[in-house]
Structure formats: structure tokens, C-alpha cells
């Protein structure tokens, strides 16, 4: 029997089940996944044409001429390009997704910089109204209950399938975010997942004052603990971890991946340490009970909280109160600030935010269940034996982390003048409008356009992750050049603005249908490496390096909750910009490195705000054109 037939045999018994909202629906996830289309390999000539178009606004004419020669060589009939393309097409036939394994390895597991700042995004939640330990623990208990409620939907396979433009999306990432952890390796990391099977996780990790605890979250009959029960258990944890002089073992996870891999092997030589680390790795998720940060005024409150979510503030604050390899860590501080940080390898932002939206809604519900009064066992404290060698590893990690913390400049801008409803009223895609404002802000600051990355979801395809929307286009470049030019009328500028937003929308649609260029080019390059042939000159060209040097790395992560995701820049002289467009306002998080003299997050925020307002006034002053 071939693979397809086998799958069909497996799928048949469940084919009659009606998807119900409640109860277990075993096999539903599998069935849904198998019905999804495979990621296509785009036509070679199409990608090469689009690559040249993408280069036009960001490189000189001279460089472009040189690249055109390389492209002409690469695309010759029977040439290198065609050979690699055939290899990719063969790979696509043999696998569920020709890209996903390669992408996981190259983008995440083989990436050697620390996950902190360089890879793991944070999310800032609205400030909660508690100011003390009691409120902190009560909120944490409710939050855990919300996580377990979501976990039940995942376990029972009753999670509602998401759709985009009427097409069902791959739901696989939801099954990867709980009970999973990244493990450091000397050249490449790996991911472990304990969500399924007999050894399914029944506990979470709680960290307080750098001390880790194993907290069982299910009763012996399999029912999840209630908020009251969880609150009692969290109080026990709090009261048995009051010492503030403990070695912050968790800080080891903030180091460069190769250094951490060495320290990890070192740490695990001891049996007690190994058991403690395995318990953390197997847990459903981590809850970090943080000490309050220094007080700041309300108007800038969100910016230090964003930093807090991304890195914990450094070794004297809460960075030791984490295990950064854990996929999901929820952070709740005594002063009401809260959010999460997640390890990026298993999932993108949207599934994380969907989980978050669910939890936030859940925490608002009144408590109905009376808790059973059975006394619960004391949560187990995870012990670590710290040898002088481990102590020295911790000290080195602290120093490196503190340098990173000092270097990261992050600002949360809440743009209050309008939200996504305004561009919609002008029949413009809100995302295209915001991206064009970023282009305008950057152009006004630096006098030229730069390579811009916006993530596009490939979840219409089985195991799809992301591709790149290149927001810098010939059309966007024309618009930003014209915006402050006295030679153009408002009408002409408004027409260029509409053309640029239309071009962005078209590129977005192309990308989500698997027709963007970035992953295809990466695939051709990796195919060459796999075939052990020399890397084609096209990929050794300066233009390729410029195209891949994303001074603007951006992502729209919409949420029902009034939150904002944040991440660090992907190049030393760049910006990391994430935004959540709400109806009447837009939340932005903007990051840059202090070590780069040319970038400044506050300056970018200022120019971005001005760009958004100027684009609105332009549209209001020019009547709608006949485009």
C-alpha cells in the first residue's frame, strides 16, 4: 500500500464523525491536516523576475546591472537554476512540506545567538489592577486555569479550525506550544514535546526569586485544579521561596547557544540537576512570579514592561526568574504588569495570541466552581547543586546578558489618533497603510529605502510557517520620494499612496498563497548545499546580502486583547517593529540597539507617528481618484 492509501485507511473510521464543539474528537486534527494542500514550489522564472523588481528600490543601478547578469546566467535553460529547481520539486513530492524542516533548522535551531532579544518575542498585556502579592497570586491562579481550559481543547482536538479568506488553516502550531522546550546543542538545538502519549505532562513550572517548583495542576481524577486550589498552591510556593540570595540557574538559558550547550552538559552531569532540568522541560508551561520593577510614570509604563517581557531587566532584576528555552513563559509581577515571552522555534505569534485572547477572556469570568477541600501535596521544589564550574558559567551568562539588556532600546507607542477603522473607511488595507507609513518614516530619517521584512503566514498549507512580504516596492519608493516633494500635487501624491498600498496588498496575497520569493530563494540555496555543489554566484552577490539585510523587521500581530508583541532587531543597525491595529488606536513596539549610533527607537516612533498623520491629511485633502 502506498503512503496515501495508508493514510486514507487510517482516516476512514473518523470520516463519519460530525465536528462537535464538545467531547473528544480523536482523529479530527489528523483528518483536517491531511486535507490541507502542500506548499507549492513557485515557478523559477517568476521568482527571478520578482527578485529583480524587489532589488530596484534598495540598490544602485550599477549593482542592479551586475545582478541582472548573474540572474541571466542562473536562469539559462538547462542551467544551475533549473537543476536546483528540479531538486526542490522532487523534495516537495516526498515531504509534507518542502520548506518546514529546513526553515526550522536554519531560522531557529542552528541560529547561535541567544534566544533572548534575538529570537524570542515578548507580549505586553494590559496592566492588571492588583498591587500586592495576594492579587498577583490570585491572577496567576486564574491565568493557569485559563491555560488548562485551552489545553483541554487541544487535547480533545476540539479547537475550532481557523480560516483566512475562507480557506482552512494548518492548526499544527497549536499542538506544539504546550509541554515543549528547546534543548541546546553544540551546533544545532532540538525541541522536545511532551503533549501527547502516555507520559503527558501534568505539571507546570513556577519560578519565584530564581527558585523553580513543580506544580501538579490536575487532581487524581484528571480534573484540572480550580482557581482556589491553585491559589493555595501558589501561596505555598511563595512562602517557601522567600530567600533572595539563590543562584539564578535560569540565567544560563540567556547565553550564546554554543556556550549554553556546554554549560547544559556540565549542569546535567549531576543527577539532581538532571531531574530538575527534565521536570522544567516536561512541564506544560512556566509561570514567572516576578519582583516589581522600579516605578515609572504611567505614560511610559509600557516601554519598561516590554523590556521586562523580552529579557527580565538583567541579572539584578528578573532575568534569573526564567527558563528561556521553555516555549511558553507567562510573567506576572507584583505591581500588576504582566505578559509573556515565548521561544520562537515551534510557533509564530498568531497561535500564541489566540491562546492569550482565550486566557484573558477566561480571567474575566466569575468563579463558579466550589473547590474540593482535600488538602493538596506541597509543590516540589526543584534542587540544583551548584559546582564552582557551574557558578562560573552563571557569572559569564550574567555578564553577557547585562550587556544585551543595556544595549536594547525598546519603546511602546500607543498611537491614539486613529486605528484600523480609518484606512478601512478609505477602502485601504490597514496593514498596507501602516507598512507604507513605516516606509515613509524610514525614508524621511535616512533619505533612502531599505530592505523590509514583514512576515506572511503560510498556514493555508500543511505545516506552513512564514514567508516574507517585501514591503519596500517600486511603488512604495515612488510614494515616499514624492511625499515631501514640492513638484507634486496632493492629488498625485494621494494616487501614489493608493497605488503603493494596492501593490502591498497584492504582494501579501501572493505571499500567503506560497508565491513570494524569499523562501524559494533560500530553498534553491539550501538545495545547492544539499547537492554538495558550489553555491551559485547569485547568492554570493552583494545585492543578495543587501536584500537579506532587513533594517526594518516588522510583523502585524492582531489580537482582540489590547496587547502588543515586541521583538529585537534582526540586524545590528536595524529596527524590530511589531504592531496590533485596534479599531480606534494602534499599539506599536519599536526596538533598536543602543550600540548603533544611527538607530533610535524614540526617533523612529516620532517619525512613524508623523507619517501616519501626514498620510491621513493627504488623503483628506485630495479627493478619491479614479484609480
Swiss-Prot record:
Pro-sequence residue ranges: 1-30
Xref: Pfam families: Carn_acyltransf
GO cellular component, one term: peroxisome
E.C. designation(s): 2.3.1.137, 2.3.1.7
SUPFAM superfamilies in the record: CoA-dependent acyltransferases
N6-acetyllysine: residues carrying this PTM: 262, 269
Cellular localisation: Endoplasmic reticulum; Peroxisome; Mitochondrion inner membrane
One GO molecular-function entry: acyl-CoA oxidase activity
Main location group: endoplasmic reticulum
Coiled coil start-end: none
Job of this protein: Catalyzes the reversible transfer of acyl groups from carnitine to coenzyme A (CoA) and regulates the acyl-CoA/CoA ratio. Also plays a crucial role in the transport of fatty acids for beta-oxidation. Responsible for the synthesis of short- and branched-chain acylcarnitines. Active towards some branched-chain amino acid oxidation pathway (BCAAO) intermediates. Trans-2-enoyl-CoAs and 2-methylacyl-CoAs are poor substrates.
Protein name as annotated: Carnitine O-acetyltransferase
Provenance organism: Columba livia (Rock dove)
Lineage of origin: Eukaryota, Metazoa, Chordata, Craniata, Vertebrata
